[in-house]
Amino acid sequence: MERFIENAMYASRWLLAPIYFGLSLGLLALALKFFQEVIHLLPSVFSMAESELILVLLSLIDMALVGGLLVMVMISGYENFVSQLDIDDNKEKLNWLGTMDSSSLKMKVAASIVAISSIHLLRIFMDAKNVDPQHLMWYVIIHMTFVVSAFAMGYLDKVTKH
């Protein structure tokens, strides 16, 4: 009975595979949205104000960071919890494949969230005159919460490894 339960629990990790594949569909949706923004940007690039262009570019950077986060979670999560990726030797291989454990993945995710939050906050600051000061304060508080959380996670990870 114990062996059956252990085998069933171990096999249940495969339930994560469609979830990680679903993230690739989310990445596809993000890529479509990215290029939709680029297509909207190109015809009006010469007529828009510099600050407006910067806001659009920050939005594109934001999407790129989220895309990188999706790839990182999708691939390293699959490798850590489901199965090793069997990539042909003749194909281009990401240098971090097989090296990111769940602890380093958490740190990369935390750093990505802080970067995404920073971009979002910068976009808000560029339009600060149209943002309620109360909302602005909460944006900063939430961002600082992300920063402090990432720092605390890094510190705790360093302390527990040594």
Swiss-Prot record:
GO CC annotations on file: plasma membrane
Annotated compartments: Cell membrane
Transmembrane segments: 15-35, 53-73, 136-156
Short name of one Pfam family: UPF0114
Keywords from the named record: Cell membrane, Membrane, Transmembrane, Transmembrane helix
InterPro entries linked to this entry: UPF0114, UPF0114_bac
Membrane topology: Multi-pass membrane protein
Disulfide bonds: none
Principal cellular location given in the protein's record: membrane
NCBIfam families: HI0507
Similarity section: Belongs to the UPF0114 family.
Name of this protein: UPF0114 protein PFLU_5318
Species: Pseudomonas fluorescens (strain SBW25)
